[in-house]
């Protein structure tokens, strides 16, 4: 029996133009055939929600996927599972979910929303999580949802000693400024001295002419002191005129008279 050469035939439904070889059309049919079968089945798995999520360790987190398939006897029965790929590209084993096929209309497209809830142990569980649907003759998975897992939440960085020193130095400067201002005000008030009460009434000249004498004081000293006080009071009354209030020099004269009277009093007493 002689070996006959292999003959290539074009796929049915693809007319071959005259003059072209059959090999290119055969290659095109091989490339288009798997996609045509996949589209004809109508199964798809789509991840809904955010493509990137973040979660703390030992905290529940959920991602969702939507399964679309034709409700026919061939695709009524299927199982839904999930798996993940870590940052190094290692794939974990598939784990079952609580999603089960639902009721639909015969020979119509049916959609099933599936939610997967996980409690991830730590940062090592960071990766892309996929929904995978297995039918008796095919398996389809989704595009995946990336989940970033953190062992702990946000923590404020510890305060550096430089920051504490800056706060302390600023507080010290504030205290010193307040104390310095208080000292300046107190010193200014002390330099002015307590003023005499302008409403103080002058003593009666008759009472000044007959004062009560202390046994240890001389008559001359007692009389001279009372007269000086009377003169100073008269000078103060003369300096309180309207013209004296208007002139700063006239306002300083009563104080000068008082100072001169005090000096004279001290000299005479000595």
UniProtKB/Swiss-Prot annotation:
It is a single-pass type I membrane protein. GO terms for molecular function: transmembrane signaling receptor activity. GO terms for cellular component: azurophil granule membrane; membrane; membrane raft; plasma membrane. The chain crosses the membrane at residues 164-184. Residues 1-42 form the signal peptide. May function in immune system as a receptor which activates via the calcineurin/NFAT-signaling pathway the downstream cytokine gene promoters. Activates the transcription of IL-13 and TNF-alpha promoters. May be involved in the regulation of B-cell, but not T-cell, development. Overexpression activates downstream effectors without ligand binding or antibody cross-linking. N-glycosylated. Residues 190-219, 234-262 are annotated as: Disordered. Glycans are attached at residue 107. Keywords: Cell membrane, Disulfide bond, Glycoprotein, Immunoglobulin domain, Membrane, Phosphoprotein, Signal, Transmembrane, Transmembrane helix. Disulfide bonds join 65-114. Residues 185-270 are cytoplasmic. The keyword Disulfide bond applies. The modification Phosphotyrosine is found at residues 220, 231. This is NFAT activation molecule 1. The keyword Phosphoprotein applies. One of its GO terms (biological process) is B cell differentiation. The ITAM domain displays no close similarity to any existing ITAMs, except for four conserved positions. The phosphorylated ITAM domain binds ZAP70 and SYK. Residues 194-204 have a biased composition (Basic and acidic residues). The gene is NFAM1. Residues 209-237 form the ITAM domain. Residues 43-163 are extracellular. Changing residue 220 to A/F: Abolishes the ITAM-mediated-activating activity. Its main location: membrane. Residues 50-150 form the Ig-like V-type domain. InterPro entries: NFAM1, Phos_immunorcpt_sig_ITAM.
